[in-house]
């Protein structure tokens, strides 16, 4: 235990006057009531124990008579006893905000959710299928920001009015709502965001029978990424198999990026495109960073670390809606679409006119697949070896 502290369960045993260790207590409990003589170590090794459970039956002739039911049947019987509903609400905690204990931390409030890319809010996530059936919508307003419908969400007679995010890949018949928001006690006014989903919390049962209805009003979201798919831009995230990758030299897969300088395509390695004067690189330490995109889960821990290390300003919900967030790095999220890259490119090239053909083509390409794959693309800070924070970068 950390710093020789007692495990919580062992403290409970001591307070009850029991000197046995918690490990031995668990072994004894399993041995007497579950294992029926089987090996505890074997069950621990297997991660499970397959056996039978005894259930008492009410019988006036023989109160001690027991019947055996396989544990699998017992589990199925428990599931079958659950109430059926058109929709199920899943209560969850966000990667950043968690259960809300740190809701007074503006870094966490402004941290975009890795999947929805939305900050300063919790919301009801629904599938496109259910949103269409309920009349719920998301749409972009004139400045490009994301707005959406409100929904009245009712669980066990309690109703909350919650904004709605239509989430690609969400299972039909399920809706999600994050805990940790809606606090009013002990928080600054700016941090009192979202709705308090703990009103729906029932012990450890985080899946609830729910009723969802369209409500009046229009909610303004602070969403940092409004494009959901690659839209034919295959250079953003390059994917291939190892077999195909080995058919070419690695330099052919990693060409030098080009930028426009005086309307001329120029390599980014050219001194002419550097905003800073060249300096002597022959002395001192040299730092580099490589990210395994196969391992990145988009958790955003690096985003918070960078925000904290460099004391980056928090701009608030209104400015985030105006695309003025000041994170020095971000983790973009892209969904796969129903069309291939080639089909997306063909759509763009064959469309005629911006306000008619191309605009409609881009709108179609922006829709994620019903069951999409998700790719994360870290976009690092652009200080290009000139920032004083580089030597202590926590990322």
Q: PLM features: residue spans?
A:
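A cross-kingdom feature strongest in bacterial/archaeal respiratory oxidoreductases
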Residues: 1, 31-328, 340
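Ferredoxin-like iron-sulfur electron-transfer modules
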Residues: 274-298, 327-334, 361-395
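Non-catalytic, well-ordered alpha-helical segments in soluble enzyme domains
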Residues: 6-33
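A broadly tuned preference for mixed-charge, low-complexity surface segments
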Residues: 7-11, 199-219, 341-361
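A short local structural element in Rossmann-fold oxidoreductases
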Residues: 13, 27, 135, 307, ...
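Short, well-ordered alpha-helical packing segments
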Residues: 12, 16, 300-303, 307, ...
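Non-heme iron-sulfur electron-transfer modules
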Residues: 309-369
């Amino acid at each position: 235990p950390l710093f020789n502290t007692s495990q919580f369960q062992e403290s409970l045993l001591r307070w009850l006057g029991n000197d046995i260790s918690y490990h031995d207590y668990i072994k004894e409990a399993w041995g007497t009531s579950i294992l029926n003589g089987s090996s505890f170590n074997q069950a621990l090794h297997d991660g499970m124990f397959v056996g039978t459970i005894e259930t008492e039956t009410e019988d006036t002739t023989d109160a001690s008579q027991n019947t055996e039911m396989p544990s699998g049947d017992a589990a199925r019987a428990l599931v079958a006893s659950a109430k059926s509903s058109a929709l199920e609400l899943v209560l969850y905690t966000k990667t950043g905000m968690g259960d809300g204990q740190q809701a007074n931390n503006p870094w966490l409030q402004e941290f975009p959710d890795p999947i929805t890319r939305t900050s300063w809010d919790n919301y009801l996530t629904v599938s496109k299928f259910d949103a269409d059936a309920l009349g719920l919508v998301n749409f972009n307003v004139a400045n490009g920001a994301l707005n959406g419908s409100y929904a009245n969400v009712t669980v066990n007679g309690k109703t909350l009015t919650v904004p709605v995010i239509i989430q690609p890949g969400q299972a039909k018949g399920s809706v999600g709502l994050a805990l940790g928001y809606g606090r009013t006690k002990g928080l600054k006014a700016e941090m009192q965001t979202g709705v308090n989903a703990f009103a729906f919390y029932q012990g450890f049962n985080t899946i609830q029978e729910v009723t969802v209805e369209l409500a009046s009003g229009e909610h303004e979201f602070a969403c940092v990424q409004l494009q959901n798919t690659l839209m034919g831009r295959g250079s953003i995230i390059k994917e291939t198999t190892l077999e195909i990758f080995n058919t070419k030299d690695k330099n052919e897969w990693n060409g030098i990026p080009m930028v426009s300088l005086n309307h001329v395509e120029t390599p980014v390695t050219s001194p002419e495109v550097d905003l800073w004067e060249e300096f002597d690189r022959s002395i001192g330490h040299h730092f580099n960073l490589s990210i395994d995109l196969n391992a990145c889960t988009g958790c955003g821990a690096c985003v918070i670390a960078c925000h904290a290390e460099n004391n980056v300003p928090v701009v608030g919900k209104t400015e985030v809606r105006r695309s003025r967030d000041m994170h020095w790095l971000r983790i973009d999220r892209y969904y796969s679409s129903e069309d291939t890259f080639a089909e997306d490119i063909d759509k763009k090239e064959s469309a005629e006119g911006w306000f008619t053909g191309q605009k409609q083509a881009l709108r179609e390409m922006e829709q994620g697949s019903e069951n999409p794959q998700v790719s994360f693309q870290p976009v690092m800070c652009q200080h290009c070896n000139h920032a004083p924070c580089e030597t202590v970068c926590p990322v």
